[in-house]
Amino acid sequence: MRSLNTLLLSLFVAMSSGAPLLKIREEKNSSLPSIKIFGTGGTIASKGSTSATTAGYSVGLTVNDLIEAVPSLAEKANLDYLQVSNVGSNSLNYTHLIPLYHGISEALASDDYAGAVVTHGTDTMEETAFFLDLTINSEKPVCIAGAMRPATATSADGPMNLYQAVSIAASEKSLGRGTMITLNDRIASGFWTTKMNANSLDTFRADEQGYLGYFSNDDVEFYYPPVKPNGWQFFDISNLTDPSEIPEVIILYSYQGLNPELIVKAVKDLGAKGIVLAGSGAGSWTATGSIVNEQLYEEYGIPIVHSRRTADGTVPPDDAPEYAIGSGYLNPQKSRILLQLCLYSGYGMDQIRSVFSGVYGG
């Protein structure tokens, strides 16, 4: 029944975005692995007004269009697909992510598929990758591919990124590596990787942790055997179908002259069950704001996680106030997802502290 409900939810989301739905390809090559591709939209599925357009484009291609544009995919794997949504990734939320999770989980639980690929916009790709890495319970690989140029652009990067994602998902070398991101010949961890540049093709990096591997001359190569990152934890959300069951966690950004009442608004008016602070430096907050934060914590007892607004670095436990939690190496957007999963799982404050301490290596 859950499989049927998940399929119906996926179809509803896809229909609301005008996307074609589901296709099972009947002609199979028994010598090749089978991969299921999940389309969500993004630049990889976008069209511009001219071949030189690299901004101001709009989503207009389906996942089937993307597959048909790369005929050589048929040499790598048998392909089926599901169009989960067809929007820019800045419009994605748990209404889309939950059916995506269930679709991937069900595909990987089946003997029919060796792995899964997600086509996705790059704006929030790291959030989806992090979410899936913590929730998909399978040794089979999930590979997320996107593009920095629309499909109509001269030298569009999407087709090769999709080809490489299918190749990675179909490779036995990828077993046990969780969710991965692939763009621009790089294979990166879904747990660590972040979009570092708004425009560059070579934008997805984990500068401190490094890449997992690379794609060269039609070969998938990894630098080291499969290993889980420090702080990785599995969260069982197999019974989750209603997005409203995910607790609200709000990110607040540090700046000079910060209004300290923003956190009060987030909790009292918006119903936040947790707060992530994108602090300056190693997660610092204003003196006045810190006083308000502590008062709010004492009144409501909600977790407050200190992360950083810088592109990289760490917020160790000692850099957060005694009542708060340091995000370790996680940026604010990933800290938010981790905190939401902790809260959904019913973790108390000590358990949440322990989870985030693990990300720091503690």
UniProtKB/Swiss-Prot annotation:
Signal peptide as annotated in the record: 1-25
Q: What is its EC number?
A: 3.5.1.1
One matching Pfam family: Asparaginase
Looking at the keywords, is Secreted present?
A: yes
Q: Name one GO cellular component term.
A: endoplasmic reticulum
The protein's predominant localisation is secreted
The Asparaginase/glutaminase domain covers which part of the protein? 33-359
**Binding residues for substrate, per the UniProt record?**
S89, T122, D123
NCBIfam families on file: asnASE_II
Query: Any other noteworthy remark?
Result: Yeast contains 2 L-asparaginase isoenzymes: cytoplasmic L-asparaginase I, and cell wall L-asparaginase II.
Listed name of the protein: L-asparaginase 2-1
The source organism is Saccharomyces cerevisiae (strain ATCC 204508 / S288c) (Baker's yeast)
Gene of this entry = ASP3-1
